[in-house]
Amino acid sequence: MHDAVVTHIDNPGPLTLASRWRMTFYVATAVGIVSMIAALAVNANRAWNVYLVAYFMFLCFGVGGLFFTALQYAVNASWVVVTRRVSSGLSAFLPAALILYIGIIIGAKQIFPWANGPMFEDPLKLKWLSLPWVAARDMAIILIWIFFAWKIIGFALKQDETGDVMLTRKAVNWSIAFMPVFAFSFTIISFDLIMSLQPHWYSTLFAIYTFAGMFQSTVALITLIFLWMKRNDGPLSKVATPSHTKDLGTFIFAFTIFMTYIGFSQYMLIYYANMPEETIFFMKRSSNGWEWLFLALPLFKFILPFFGMLSQGAKKTEKWLMAVCVIIFVGQFLDIYWLVMPAMHETFAPTVWMEIGIWLGFAGIFGLTVSRFYSRYSVLPVKDPYMLESANWRFWE
């Protein structure tokens, strides 16, 4: 508990990361590369599908960190300033995501049915789902995200040096501009990478569904890193309060409910309408062994996080909150896996070493890029005009 009013904050500087962490990230990256090469030799189709699962999960973390940062700027939230540099760091993965998209292009014929030849009579849809056009717009979208991250987070980093209050106003304006851009661009990339796996199927709720999963899991990741940085005299230990922990827990709880609402709404509407061109999506994903994963998703995405975070005390208990965050990560991976794999694999028959190995590769690259950001810049925006207000946040105590 922090009972005294904070009147001055020393700059903790960049994160000093133990060498074992960096070595862990390098090893994970190497494991991923070796696993991908071996997987391509064993089953190229499955390898590229697993690549897409891991790619989309970490892409969501990257843009999710940017979205969370921009959202807090846009609404002028002061309590979250202590955590802002944590969320900003996640966007450091976006340049790597742009490069890793080349893998999606290389494996496109193994991933997307429409990449193997014309599938549509509609000339507009035929042009929309052509590999050059899909790759061009998706990479352009990631470039746009990188540009907004450079502007919004760049203002905050410059403010660390100058203390210019007007930089906050500029960050707010750019964040507001980013909101509609994000909504449109994330919808497009969700359609291109996931919904187009079954090109004759569509859902008007699909982009909201992928957004809900993205935001729930991203806030869980932000919370996990934040709690790690504030424990054992970490760099955030002197400014982080139980109220920050409680508010992040409340965010997770709220978007667990939102995720469930959207997921149920999509299922209920398709089930009730009972139109063959829509029900095929769930038919593929609730038979031939996939039903077990279908039934597991509510457990990891709703039941465990919801009841685990239902009490006020649970949201402020750090070890418990960290455990819930891990459960949400597992749920997010299983959800994306369930969205991707049944489109090309009729029977649920996971190749565990392939899934874990390729995922570790992406986790390693993500860890290297994000930790590099934390190691270069201060983990606190100490000259932000709302910094002291955030450090004195005591709403839930």
Question: In which residue ranges do the predicted regions lie?
Answer:
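TerminUS-proximal long segments
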Residues: 4, 21, 118, 300-304, ...
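Hydrophobic alpha-helical membrane-insertion segments
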Residues: 91-107, 254-263, 323-330
